[in-house]
Amino acid sequence: MNQNSSVAEATLQLNSGEKPSPGSIPFISSGQHGNISTSATSSTSTSSGSALAVVKSAVKKPTKDRHTKVDGRGRRIRMPAMCAARVFQLTRELGHKSDGETIEWLLQQAEPAIIASTGTGTIPANFSTLNASLRSGGGSTLFSQASKSSSSPLSFHSTGMSLYEDNNGTNGSSVDPSRKLLNSAANAAVFGFHHQMYPPIMSTERNPNTLVKPYREDYFKEPSSAAEPSESSQKASQFQEQELAQGRGTANVVPQPMWAVAPGTTNGGSAFWMLPMSGSGGREQMQQQPGHQMWAFNPGNYPVGTGRVVTAPMGSMMLGGQQLGLGVAEGNMAAAMRGSRGDGLAMTLDQHQHQLQHQEPNQSQASENGGDDKK
């Protein structure tokens, strides 16, 4: 009892902060010290266990999470679980190395719709801070082209046209043949490659099935499948009617003759030939116009000149679209020949014309004299 009372007095003195005297602190045996230490350790263990339980309960995530985190743009984004599942599936199907590459591919496929809704491409404002993936190679170039084209006011139509032609023009069939025909006809009219002749590319023998989809203003909306065959068939029929009408109009045009110079085989020079041009109905035109004949100027028969025939350019000889040798006077041919370097045939024609002019007044005077004699 005395020992217990002394221990209690010592604990009271420690709690109160008073310094006990050395003689007042009783002696504690080893067994009593062991009991006190075990009780203290048990109390600390129970307190630490309760603290760990509180920490674990706070870190625990909720089980009902409708979103899944997907890596992209250098940070973590949140998207619906269905979208994330589809991205994972596309990554496996397309053989991409990461889900971010799949998202980049999806953005490339959605480029026309993005341009239609926002007016710009998928390139972000802070491109310098973006860790763009260059594995595919086509993503960054496509984005840069879209950004460059978006600076112009016609960026929407120009970019859409390029994408429309690229998506449908893998084998070169996206080019409308009507455009080719119009361009070829314009070039032929400007440069004169087909002079008053029907262009061979615009022949009436055309397969109507080769006419592809015509030019559309809206590239992002496909026409209805039911209305498309009827429209294409109507346009094909109209195009054929226009070709037939143009063919009838050009069939009545009289083809122009072609002048040529044969190579000289002897020292006498070469011959000057006029070759009549015949169109598709060559035999009928030859029957209707018997005046088309092949005739030549032999330089050996003309003593005047050096014996060489002048090669005049086609532009100077085709005077007003008229036919030389059929309805053009000899003076016109002589005028055309004067502009060239030689003078053999031109001088001969001038002399011949001069002789004809002198013969006409002589014949008129002779006829007048004959009439006076009869009177």
From Swiss-Prot:
Residues 20-51, 222-238, 354-365 have a biased composition (Low complexity). Residues 63-117 form the TCP domain. It is found in: Nucleus. InterPro entries: TF_TCP_subgr (IPR017887), Transcription_factor_TCP (IPR005333). Its main location: nucleus. Residues 1-18 have a biased composition (Polar residues). GO terms for biological process: regulation of DNA-templated transcription. GO terms for cellular component: nucleus. Pfam families: TCP. The keyword Ribonucleoprotein does not apply. Residues 1-76, 220-248, 349-375 are annotated as: Disordered. Residues 58-67 have a biased composition (Basic residues). Keywords: DNA-binding, Nucleus, Transcription, Transcription regulation. One of its GO terms (molecular function) is DNA-binding transcription factor activity. PANTHER family: TRANSCRIPTION FACTOR TCP22-RELATED, TRANSCRIPTION FACTOR TCP4-RELATED. This is Transcription factor TCP22. It comes from Arabidopsis thaliana (Mouse-ear cress).
